[in-house]
């Protein structure tokens, strides 16, 4: 639990990990069933991040919580989520049970390739999977059209619908 000395402390008097734990305690004090975790581990060093993830997983199991876990940290997503929704510019690109499953959407593939690129052991796997330039979204087309290496004319003119690939895997792409 938290020591009572934390009651009179200000946020700037706590470490990053302590602030996260206090935030978690504040969120859980009303015994919710659903908790939004928006970048819950983004500003933490690796050791503290892992402790917070373990705490969140433990609390999820003990209190049977449901999390909406919003993050750019693909490793954290892999550890805590049992369903992943990948979005680009507010549009759903892919819904899948795990990032360990076969990835179908070009944007999800690019995200994973970029994450692998930060690991020196995986540098040979790092390939450019999207165009570098960031152009305005075509209002009638796919949000990822300008950056996708596989985009066709249909992608520019019509937004793709999210469709089943299998029971738990959905993708929004004209080419899949």
Predicted feature residues:
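Conserved "ABC signature" C-loop
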Residues: 1-6
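Charged, flexible cofactor/metal-binding loops and thiol motifs
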Residues: 95-176
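Walker B catalytic motif
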Residues: 10, 39-40
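A short, proline-enriched helix->beta-strand linker immediately N-terminal to the Walker B motif
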Residues: 29-33
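Hydrophobic anchor residue at the start of the ABC signature
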Residues: 24, 36, 52
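Conserved ABC ATPase signature
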Residues: 10-14, 18
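P-loop NTP-binding/switch modules centered on Walker-like glycine-rich loops
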Residues: 44, 48-123
């Amino acid at each position: 639990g938290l020591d009572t000395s934390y009651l009179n402390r200000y946020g700037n008097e706590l470490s990053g990990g302590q602030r996260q734990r206090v935030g978690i305690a504040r969120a859980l004090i009303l015994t919710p069933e659903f908790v939004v975790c928006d970048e819950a581990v983004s500003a933490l060093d690796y050791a503290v991040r892992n402790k917070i993830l373990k705490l969140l997983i433990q609390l999820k199991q003990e209190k049977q919580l449901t999390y909406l876990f919003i993050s750019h940290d693909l490793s954290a997503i892999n550890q805590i989520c049992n369903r992943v929704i990948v979005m680009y510019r507010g549009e759903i690109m892919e819904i899948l049970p795990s990032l360990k499953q076969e990835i179908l959407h070009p944007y999800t593939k690019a995200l994973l390739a970029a994450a692998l690129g930060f690991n020196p052991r995986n540098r040979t796997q790092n390939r450019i999977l999207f165009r570098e330039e960031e152009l305005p979204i075509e209002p009638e087309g796919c949000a990822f059209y300008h950056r996708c290496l596989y985009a066709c004319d249909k992608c520019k003119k019509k937004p793709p619908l999210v469709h089943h690939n299998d029971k738990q895997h959905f993708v929004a792409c004209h080419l899949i």
